[in-house]
Amino acid sequence: NIIIRFRVYNEGFGLRYEFPQQKSLNYFIIKEEHTQFAMTGDHTAWWLPGDYDTQEQETQETKLSEIRARFKKAVNWDNSSVSVFSETGVQTALQMKTADGLYINIHEAACEDYATMHLNLDDKNFVFESWLTPDATGLKGCMQTPCHTPWRTVKVSDDARDMLSTSLTLNLNEPCKIE
């Protein structure tokens, strides 16, 4: 059994996959995750090249359809370690703006004991798919039920400043345990 849990807020939503305790599933390995985010058009995007080893890249501004053409030039190949996975792969948080002026942000929250998420773009259909960072052996995660994935978050607003002021990501993380 798997539960797909959604939490919806005024400024967006989060979703995650939950695996309850069950007789037929105790330990399992995550090979891939195929969460998809379908865009409505060729939006302007502010993005970093998808790289397993570093986030020390410069932010790029292009249309979604232009990511592939810009990708090789966008990567800082002088970093001591570079591990890109696709010519249309980007890091989260990914910020976009539609032709109508709507801002969209895709990210994650409560990422604990699970691989971090990048996004791989199908640049013909403008669909992003989650792309998890593997460990040294190529696995994306070793899980034991009951367990869950991080939240996959989508924030929307007609004002880019709202992306910084929203509490959506904070609300999806566990409360601080430090007293």
Model-derived features: where do they sit?
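N-terminal accessory beta-strand-rich subdomains and adjacent acidic, glycine-rich linkers
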Residues: 1-178
